[in-house]
C-alpha cells in the first residue's frame, strides 16, 4: 500500500457539520507517520531480509485470518478539547475565550473512552461495531462528537482511530415558574467529573411554597466496569426522595444481554385542579410511593431483526397519608373549604408484587442528520420499527389485587420523499381485574398515549427546519387518582398550566426553526423559532373535568448551544393565547433544555403519575 493511499484513507471520511474534521484527519497521521515510513520502505526495497520479514508477516496474517476476519492490531484514541486550538475555523479574536474554556474543562480520560467502545486489540475488525461505538460515545453526556475509522496495514491488520471531542460539561440551569416567569429554582450539574464521565448534580427550588433541594450521582462505568449506576436523594415538598439503580444495558445492536435493578421511595403531592368560584383551584393530596424491580432481557437474531425476551419481578406500594390541602393559601377561604371534602375515589392503599414477562421485536437502523433538534449539530436518528409487549401477573400472596397487567408499545419512523422524516409511537396499558363483580367490565385503569412527528428541511444547506407534532393522551375506567390538564406543561405554551382539565387531551404544534448564525457563530450556535399550538381536552365523564372549546397560542423563541455544534440545546419561549381566552398581556415565558416538540418522545408525566406501568423491553436498549 502506497503512502498516498494512506493519506486517501485518512481524508476520505465526510465532515461533520458544525465541527471541523479535516485538521483531525491530518493530526491522526501523527500517530501513523511511522506507519507511512514503513510503507514507503516496504514498497521501495527489494526482497531481502526486510522482504523476508514482510513475507513472514503475510504468513502470520494468513494464519490469523483462517477464521475469516482481519484483526485489529492497534487502537489509537485522539480526544480533543471543547475548543480545539488547531481548528482553522475558530475565530482568532476569541482565542482567549477558547483557552479559558479549555482550562476550566478537564478532558475525558482515555480509559473512559476505551471502556465505552465495543472492540479491542486482537479482535476482528467490524465496521458495524465501529459505527455502534460512535453512537455509544455520542450518546454520552460528555462526548460532543465521535468519529471512528480503520486504516488497513501491510500485514492485513487494522489500526483503528477513535477521534472524539469533549462536550462542555458544567451547567448552571435555572428553573422558571411558568405562571409568573420568576425564578423558581437552580440546578448545578457536572456531567464529566474530573474527566471520568461521572455525573453529579445539586438543585434547590420552591414547590408548593415549600423549599426543596437534593443531589444526584450517576456513572456509566461503575467501579471501572460497564455497569450504569444512579443515586438520588432529595427533600420534597412533603417528605423525602430516594432512588437507586444498577443496570447493564444493551451495548449497541450487537449486545445480547441486559439487566436492571432499581428501588425508589418518594413522598409527593398528587395535584388536582377542582372548580372554584371563578377559577380552577389546586388541591394537594399527599402520596407516598415505593417501588422496586429487578429483571433481565435477552436478544436473539441479527442486526436489523432482533427479538427480545425477558422477565422481571416488579413491586409497588402506595399509601395516601394525611389530609388534603390547598396549594395556594388565598384559596383557603370559607367559600372553598368544602372542596377538600371532594376527595376523589380510589385513594386506597396499593400493594402489588408481580412477575412480568417481556417480549419485543426491534428492526431499526440509524442515519445522521443535521439541525433537527440541535441548533446546528449533527444527530443520530433511529428509523425502523420497534414493538413490545409486557404481561405482568400479580402474586396474590403479596398483593392487594388479583389482576393481570398488559402493556403494548409500537414505535415507527422512516424517511419519505422530499427530505421528510416522520415517525409515530403508540403506548397502551391496562389491567384485567379477576376480582371484578360478575357482569362488570374487567378491564380498568386503561391509559393510552399517541405521538406523531415530522421534520422537513428544504435542503441540507438550508437554515430552516419545519417541525410538526401531534400528541394525544387519555384514561378510561380509572380507579386510581387521575387527571389531565391542558396548558403549557402539555404543549400549549401560551396558556397557564391549568387552563382546562379532563380525562382526554390532544395538542397539535407547528414550528419553524431557523439558524441565525450571529453574532459569534465560532463561539456558540444561536437560532430562533416561531410556533403555533392548538389543543383541547375532553372531560370524559370525569368528576373534576371541564369540556372547553379549542385553545390556541402563538409565540417566538430563541435556541442556543455551546460550544458550536453541540447537541444540547437551551430554549427560551414567549407565547400568548389567541383562542380560548386571554390576550397579549397574558404572555407566558418558558425556559428549558431540549426542544419542546419533536422526535425525542417522552412519556406523558400526568399519565405516568397515575399509571402502574411495569417494565418494558425498550428500557434496556442503549442507545435507544
Model-predicted segments: where are they?
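C-terminal transmembrane beta-barrel domains of outer membrane proteins
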Residues: 3, 386-624
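Bacterial N-terminal signal peptides
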Residues: 29-40
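Transmembrane beta-strand segments that form the barrel wall of outer-membrane beta-barrel proteins
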Residues: 117, 150, 168-178, 184-207, ...
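Outer-envelope beta-barrel architecture signal
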Residues: 69-73, 158, 168-170, 182, ...
Amino acid at each position: 500500500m502506497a503512502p498516498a493511499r494512506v493519506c486517501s484513507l485518512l481524508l476520505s471520511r465526510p465532515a461533520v457539520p458544525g465541527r471541523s474534521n479535516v485538521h483531525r484527519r491530518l493530526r491522526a497521521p501523527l500517530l501513523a507517520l511511522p506507519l507511512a515510513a514503513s510503507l514507503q520502505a516496504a514498497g521501495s526495497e527489494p526482497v531481502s531480509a526486510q522482504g523476508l520479514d514482510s513475507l513472514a508477516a503475510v504468513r502470520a496474517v494468513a494464519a490469523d485470518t483462517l477464521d475469516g476476519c482481519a484483526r485489529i492490531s492497534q487502537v489509537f484514541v485522539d480526544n480533543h478539547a471543547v475548543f480545539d486550538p488547531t481548528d482553522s475555523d475558530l475565530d482568532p479574536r476569541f482565542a482567549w475565550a477558547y483557552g479559558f474554556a479549555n482550562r476550566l474543562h478537564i478532558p475525558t480520560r482515555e480509559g473512559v473512552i476505551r471502556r465505552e467502545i465495543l472492540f479491542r486489540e486482537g479482535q476482528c475488525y467490524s465496521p458495524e461495531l465501529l459505527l455502534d461505538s460512535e453512537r455509544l460515545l455520542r450518546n454520552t453526556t460528555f462526548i460532543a462528537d465521535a468519529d471512528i475509522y480503520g486504516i488497513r496495514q501491510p500485514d492485513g491488520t487494522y489500526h483503528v482511530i477513535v477521534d472524539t471531542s469533549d462536550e462542555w460539561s458544567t451547567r448552571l440551569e435555572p428553573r422558571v415558574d411558568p405562571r409568573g416567569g420568576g425564578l423558581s429554582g437552580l440546578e448545578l450539574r457536572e456531567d464529566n467529573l474530573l474527566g471520568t464521565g461521572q455525573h453529579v448534580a445539586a438543585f434547590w427550588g420552591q414547590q408548593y411554597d415549600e423549599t426543596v433541594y437534593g443531589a444526584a450521582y450517576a456513572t456509566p462505568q461503575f467501579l471501572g466496569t460497564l455497569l450504569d449506576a444512579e443515586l438520588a436523594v432529595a427533600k420534597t415538598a412533603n417528605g423525602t426522595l430516594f432512588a437507586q439503580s444498577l443496570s447493564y444495558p444493551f451495548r449497541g445492536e450487537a449486545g445480547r444481554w441486559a439487566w436492571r435493578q432499581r428501588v425508589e421511595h418518594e413522598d409527593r403531592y398528587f395535584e388536582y385542579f377542582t372548580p372554584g368560584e371563578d377559577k380552577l383551584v389546586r388541591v394537594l393530596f399527599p402520596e407516598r410511593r415505593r417501588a422496586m424491580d429487578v429483571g433481565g432481557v435477552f436478544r436473539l437474531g441479527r442486526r436489523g431483526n432482533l427479538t427480545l425476551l425477558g422477565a422481571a419481578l416488579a413491586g409497588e406500594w402506595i399509601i395516601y397519608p394525611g389530609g388534603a390541602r390547598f396549594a395556594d393559601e388565598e384559596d383557603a377561604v370559607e367559600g372553598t373549604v368544602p372542596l377538600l371534602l371532594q376527595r376523589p375515589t380510589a385513594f386506597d392503599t396499593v400493594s402489588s408484587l408481580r412477575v412480568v414477562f417481556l417480549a419485543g421485536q426491534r428492526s431499526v437502523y440509524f442515519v445522521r442528520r443535521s439541525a433537527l433538534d440541535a441548533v446546528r449539530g449533527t444527530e443520530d436518528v433511529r428509523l425502523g420499527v420497534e414493538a413490545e409487549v409486557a404481561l405482568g401477573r400479580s402474586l396474590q400472596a403479596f398483593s392487594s389485587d388479583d389482576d393481570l397487567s398488559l402493556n403494548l408499545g409500537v414505535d415507527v419512523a422512516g424517511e419519505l420523499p422530499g427530505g421528510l422524516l416522520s415517525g409515530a409511537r403508540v403506548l397502551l396499558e391496562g389491567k384485567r381485574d379477576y376480582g371484578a363483580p360478575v357482569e362488570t367490565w374487567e378491564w380498568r385503569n386503561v391509559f393510552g398515549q399517541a405521538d406523531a412527528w415530522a421534520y422537513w428541511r428544504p435542503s441540507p444547506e438550508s437554515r430552516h427546519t419545519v417541525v410538526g407534532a401531534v400528541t394525544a393522551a387519555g384514561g378510561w375506567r380509572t380507579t386510581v387518582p387521575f387527571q389531565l390538564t391542558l396548558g403549557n406543561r402539555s404543549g400549549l405554551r401560551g396558556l397557564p398550566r391549568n387552563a382546562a382539565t379532563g380525562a382526554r387531551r390532544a395538542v397539535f404544534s407547528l414550528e419553524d426553526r431557523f439558524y441565525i448564525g450571529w453574532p459569534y457563530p465560532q463561539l456558540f450556535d444561536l437560532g430562533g423559532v416561531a410556533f403555533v399550538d392548538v389543543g383541547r381536552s375532553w372531560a370524559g365523564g370525569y368528576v373534576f373535568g371541564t369540556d372547553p372549546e379549542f385553545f390556541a397560542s402563538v409565540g417566538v423563541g430563541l435556541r442556543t448551544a455551546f460550544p458550536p455544534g453541540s447537541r444540547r440545546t437551551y430554549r427560551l419561549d414567549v407565547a400568548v393565547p389567541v383562542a380560548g381566552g386571554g390576550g397579549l398581556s397574558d404572555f407566558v415565558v418558558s425556559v428549558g433544555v431540549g426542544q419542546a416538540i419533536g422526535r425525542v418522545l417522552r412519556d406523558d408525566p400526568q399519565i405516568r403519575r397515575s399509571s402502574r406501568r411495569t417494565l418494558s423491553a425498550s428500557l434496556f436498549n442503549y442507545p435507544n
